[in-house]
Amino acid sequence: MKQTDATNIEESIQTDFKKDMSYGDYLQLDSLLTSQQRLSDHHDEMLFIVIHQTSELWMKLILHEMTAAIQAIADDQLERSFKMLARVSKIQQQLIQSWSVLSTLTPAEYLEFRDSLGHSSGFQSYQNRQIEFSLGFKNAQMLRVYEHETALFAQLNDDLQTPSIYDETVRAMHRRGLPIDEAVLNRDVTQDWEADASVEAAWAIVYQDVEQYWDLYELGEKLLDIGSQQQMWRFNHMSTVERIIGQKPGTGGSSGVSYLRRVLDHRFFPELWSVRTKL
């Protein structure tokens, strides 16, 4: 077969990896690509596994970026957090799109391997729980799901007690001289965020004087992007589940679509929404 410019390998390309690290070595592909172990013989179980595993990898990156962004805000380096938060928003778009791939799984196909899942469920995703905690959606009762794993339970309990990105944002607003009630600044951060009039009023000041508070204004918009994307992810999750299992209970024991629909009623960063009506 005649070699062409397109098929001929360049002489400078590295081909000897006996003593050097290769692409596969760096990414640990041997372990990564052998972790998709089907528990049934059904073809479509591979789709189910890969979608969930890749979602967990994206969630790991979200947590990596969120942790750094929260620290930047706590250090009053708001602009440094913008790139991280913009990246989180892009990752969320990938996660949202993944539901359209999973929705190619029909009810008949899912039934072929559903029993193999036992009581394992996406509800038990601890990284998704950590993301929700970092955004301010907290519920200590959720930790009961993880009591069987001592180290993980301890980590999630620490996450529950760590101020969310919204807690740190409101504290940063206070340090800038914006009036925030002491009760909000000293609130129990293990509890779900509840809308507060003083926080809404502070955001109104920011949005009415963008030039003076540009960094806080931009941070508010970045948070709203992330909150909106998280709601879209939840909606697509609910829609995909209903398309595949209808109104049946989830494998983890939840009410399935009914539970996911109730979760949709929760809104992240409520004052960033309500202030728009006040302006």
Swiss-Prot record:
**Molecular-function GO term, any one:** metal ion binding
Query: Which GO biological process annotations does it have?
Result: L-tryptophan catabolic process to acetyl-CoA; L-tryptophan catabolic process to kynurenine
Q: In which pathway does it act?
A: Amino-acid degradation; L-tryptophan degradation via kynurenine pathway; L-kynurenine from L-tryptophan: step 1/2
* UniProt keyword annotations, A-Z: Dioxygenase, Heme, Iron, Metal-binding, Oxidoreductase, Tryptophan catabolism
Family indicated by similarity: Belongs to the tryptophan 2,3-dioxygenase family.
Assembly behavior? Homotetramer.
Name of this chain's protein: Tryptophan 2,3-dioxygenase
Q: Which organism is it from?
A: Exiguobacterium sibiricum (strain DSM 17290 / CCUG 55495 / CIP 109462 / JCM 13490 / 255-15)
Q: What is the lineage of its organism?
A: Bacteria, Bacillati, Bacillota, Bacilli, Bacillales
